[in-house]
Amino acid sequence: MAKYTEAKCRMCRREGCKLFLKGDRCFTDKCAYDRRPYAPGQHGRARKKVSEYAVQLREKQKTRRIYGILERQFHGYFVKADMQKGVTGTNLLVILERRLDNVVYRLGFANSRNQARQLVRHGVFTLNGRKVNIPSLQVRLGDTIEVPEKNRKIPVLAEAQEVIARRGCPAWLEADGAAFKGTVKAMPQRDDIQFPVNEQLIVELYSK
């Protein structure tokens, strides 16, 4: 399966903002973007004339990298969002937020989406009482994500209560760190997505 091989901190510098790809490290003095907030490479500091297409492309790349999704799947999500009722850009972000690996991350069971994806692939969680290992699975209203007793000693999961208390979780989710369980109590809304993204630029890019 294809995957990103570029250093994660270089991705943040390339996109010009923190993508929070390395979990807690992004909140410390070790964050590469805080130390060098400019594009990587010899000409990273140089001022460049940016075209409309380049702005749209960067917005798409930034969003893909935040969720760790490759182009083919991301475009598939856009097609699906465009076929739904409502605003296409908002539909796209809601689809991305409803991915199981993102929900695991949002609930505080992982320090990053990449880590959440690995945990899901290893079958660490159950969805409505059944073992799942598909990171892209779309959660639904009322779904319950839980860590079985035998998996609760995994270090990152043992810290779940602390992470949930420190980071919290979105209003559309309910996390119970003591029970190693989370519930989807509503569908995500645009206001629940806090990272800086202009989804309309993505729509304009794909509509050309």
Curated annotation (Swiss-Prot):
PROSITE patterns: RIBOSOMAL_S4 (PS00632), S4 (PS50889). It comes from the Bacteria. It holds the Pfam family S4. GO terms for molecular function: rRNA binding; structural constituent of ribosome. Disulfide bonds: none annotated. CDD domains: S4 (cd00165). Residues 98-161 form the S4 RNA-binding domain. InterPro entries: Ribosomal_uS4, Ribosomal_uS4_bac-type, Ribosomal_uS4_CS, Ribosomal_uS4_N, S4_RNA-bd, S4_RNA-bd_sf. GO terms for biological process: ribosomal small subunit biogenesis; translation. Keywords: Ribonucleoprotein, Ribosomal protein, RNA-binding, rRNA-binding. GO terms for cellular component: small ribosomal subunit. SMART domains: Ribosomal_S4, S4. Transmembrane segments: none annotated. Belongs to the universal ribosomal protein uS4 family. PANTHER family: 30S 40S RIBOSOMAL PROTEIN (PTHR11831), SMALL RIBOSOMAL SUBUNIT PROTEIN US4M (PTHR11831:SF4). Part of the 30S ribosomal subunit. Contacts protein S5. The interaction surface between S4 and S5 is involved in control of translational fidelity. One of the primary rRNA binding proteins, it binds directly to 16S rRNA where it nucleates assembly of the body of the 30S subunit. This is Small ribosomal subunit protein uS4. It comes from Desulfovibrio desulfuricans (strain ATCC 27774 / DSM 6949 / MB). The gene is rpsD.
